Structure formats: C-alpha cells, structure tokens
Amino acid sequence: ESLGTGVATHLSQNRNFAGIILETPFTSMIDAAKKFYPYIPVGLLLKDKFENKNKIKNVKSPILIMHGEKDQIVPFEMGQKMFEIANEPKYSYFTKYDNHMMEYDENLIKTLNSFLINLN
C-alpha cells in the first residue's frame, strides 16, 4: 500500500514476476509531498524520490492497480496516472467509495481472484 508501491515498482522493473498488485500507488514522492507541502522545495530534501511514474515503464509483468477516489493521502489521480503509464497487461480496480485504506469487500476480492487466476 502507498509507500510499499514505490518499493514494489522499483523491484519489479528488472524482474519477471508472475504479477504485481499496487494498492494506492503514487507517481513520485515529490508529487505526493507537494500535496501537503506546496511551498517547500521537497525535491531538494528527498534522498530517494521514488520516481514510480518513470520506473513503471520498465515493468513487464501483469499489473493490477487499485485506488479509491476518496483517498486523502495519495490523490486518486496518481493511481489513474500510474495505470495510464503501465504496460499491458494491466488491470485496474478503481472505486468511488474507498479512501486510502481500501475496504476488502466482495468486489475487491473478486477482482483479486480474477487477476490471480489469470496469471501464468
């Protein structure tokens, strides 16, 4: 979830995993930090910028991106952007009602099962 998606995206760039699931991913740490600290030069302060929007272009494994529109920590638009940039095969689970902590309801479980069943 969120910060873990930076690590997962980084590790997935040069490996052939059966599949990757990113829950509430962010495009970069700079983009995410600017939401809370718009007047601070966060790019100068961060050692690892977690440029996920660049790294996801190198991911060749099937990917499922999940994000809720009501997320108040990582903007929903970042999850959408990550999905747009991701290579095929790619799948999404976007909801109108979930916030940063997604509810593992019947719809989400069905999506996860479907994604996992279709992996090689």
Segments from the language model and where they lie:
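Alpha/beta-hydrolase superfamily serine-hydrolase fold, recognizing
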Residues: 36-45, 113
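Active-site nucleophile elbow and catalytic-triad environment of alpha/beta-hydrolase enzymes
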Residues: 41-55, 61
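Short alpha-helix in the alpha/beta-hydrolase fold that links the catalytic acid
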Residues: 52, 61, 75-84, 107-108
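Short beta-strand/loop motif that positions the catalytic acidic residue
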Residues: 58-60, 64-71
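Acidic catalytic loop of the alpha/beta-hydrolase fold
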Residues: 69-74, 99-102
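Catalytic histidine neighborhood in serine/cysteine hydrolases
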Residues: 80-103
